[in-house]
């Protein structure tokens, strides 16, 4: 098996290494001390092509293969795993749309990420269920007009305080239902110019379609401090039928595909961190 890198992959590696050296490494300690969300770095990563790697070419995305994506994530993680986690979670939230969404949904939900540096959140984990999907309580119920209502709480959600779109796994019909749906909840777009630093504040979002989302106080974490993590509560959020990905009974299958994408990325984050730790340790030998 040939593990050599092609010219495109070598070019991406060179780009991400220069980005880490010039934009991340000189600033992370001060940013962590000041509890500042790295909007400026996220913006520059977007302009450099180091974020939103999985978005299809049909909507002017990179449609980067899994191995090359892992190389980019590993490279960013060498600089800071919080920043790489925030960047990677955009793909975590959006890859299901690329895999199972219609052309209309790809244009509706993915194209905005190509056009501006916004963030997405992938909402799976719950306070009373962890990541055990069978114990999940968030659910959608169908109204007489054909629209759906989403209610439920999620926790430990990356990018939550700054997200412009939420990908949500929930039960169908009732909290104890046997089927799961994967729904997309877009909200008003948030950029660095809208919320430069949310600090320890909560955030309440009025959903354009109806209902509201309450974002809890950001978690004060031991590590990955430049990655925002918070709880998300959906209260009577209106979901249009075309905001449900694929079959509303097959959400679990779709999310498994997302997790299959995520696992190599998490491994790449660990590898980038290990390489950085090794290099820093060598300085003291």
Language-model regions: role of each:
Residues 82-104, 130, 144:
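N-terminal glycine-rich flavin-associated loop
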Residues 138-141:
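A structural signal for short hydrophobic beta-strand segments in well-ordered beta-sheet cores
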Residues 128-131, 156-159, 172-174, 221-228:
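Short Gly/Pro-enriched turn/cap motifs at secondary-structure boundaries
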Residues 147, 151-213:
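A short core secondary-structure module
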Residues 78, 129, 155-160, 261-265:
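Glycine-rich phosphate/pyrophosphate-binding beta-alpha loops
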Residues 4-5, 78, 202-204, 210-285:
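Glycine-rich beta->alpha junctions and the first turn(s) of the following alpha-helix
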């Amino acid at each position: 098996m040939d593990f050599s890198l092609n010219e495109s992959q070598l070019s991406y590696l060179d780009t991400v290494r220069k980005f880490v050296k010039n934009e991340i490494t000189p600033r992370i300690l001060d940013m962590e001390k000041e509890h500042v969300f790295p909007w400026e770095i996220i913006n520059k990563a977007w302009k450099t092509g180091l974020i939103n790697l999985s978005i299809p070419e049909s909507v002017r995305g990179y449609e980067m293969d899994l191995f090359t994506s892992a190389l980019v994530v590993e490279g960013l993680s060498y600089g800071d795993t919080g920043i790489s986690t925030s960047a990677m979670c955009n793909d975590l939230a959006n890859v299901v749309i690329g895999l199972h969404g219609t052309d209309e949904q790809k244009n509706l939900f993915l194209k905005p990420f190509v056009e501006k540096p916004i963030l997405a959140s992938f909402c799976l984990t719950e306070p009373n269920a962890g990541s055990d999907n069978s114990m999940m309580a968030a659910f959608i119920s169908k109204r007489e007009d054909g629209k759906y209502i989403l209610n439920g709480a999620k926790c430990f959600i990356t990018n939550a305080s700054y997200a412009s779109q939420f990908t949500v796994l929930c039960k169908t019909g009732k909290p104890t239902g046997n089927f799961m749906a994967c729904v997309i909840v877009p909200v008003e777009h948030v950029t660095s110019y809208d919320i430069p630093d949310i600090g320890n504040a909560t955030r309440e979002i009025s959903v354009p379609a109806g209902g509201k989302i309450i974002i809890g106080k950001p978690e004060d974490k031991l590590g990955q401090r430049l990655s925002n993590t918070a709880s998300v509560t959906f209260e009577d959020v209106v979901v249009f039928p075309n905001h449900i990905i694929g079959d509303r009974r097959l959400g679990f299958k779709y999310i498994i595909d997302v997790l299959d994408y995520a696992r190599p990325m998490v491994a790449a984050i660990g590898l980038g961190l290990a390489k950085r730790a090794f290099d820093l340790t060598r300085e003291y030998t």
